[in-house]
Amino acid sequence: MLWLIAIFLFIVILVLLFLLNFYKDPNRTVPKGRNIVAPADGRIISIIDTSKNKLMIKKGLIGKVRIFTKGIAKECYIISIFMSPFDVHINRAPIEGTVKSIKHTKGKFFKAYDLERSFENEKNEIIIKNKKLKVKVIQIAGFLARRIKCYVKKNQKVNKGQKIGMI
């Protein structure tokens, strides 16, 4: 009987350690100057140039890419960052500016590293604009991280590096 209690406690401790790691929120030092910071920790899994001469991707995906870039520009870059369970899941504003729009879309929960299928996942789109730039941060839920929290509201001013949400 004692070994059952030991196994149970071991599993509880593992789950608690995982949750503490998953919800960690270390302090960040935001670089000064005219630059853009990454909105998320993780690994860049793709960079898509949407200009007419560069956009050569699988048939069927091009329409989804155009939907993602709606409200920004005809020519831009889509940078996909995959967050593993061991990365920080807090999202930050890549630029200083004003939140121009927020759009939440219900969807599926496919694996986040599958770029093509992740377009169908639940998502939250935040457009931030300043005098020189307009940036869209798209928070996409996945198989493990299924909830999206948005910390900002429309017309709210944000600083570069400020917390804007969590996946």
Located regions from the model:
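Contiguous, well-folded functional domains in the mature portion of proteins
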Residues: 1-167
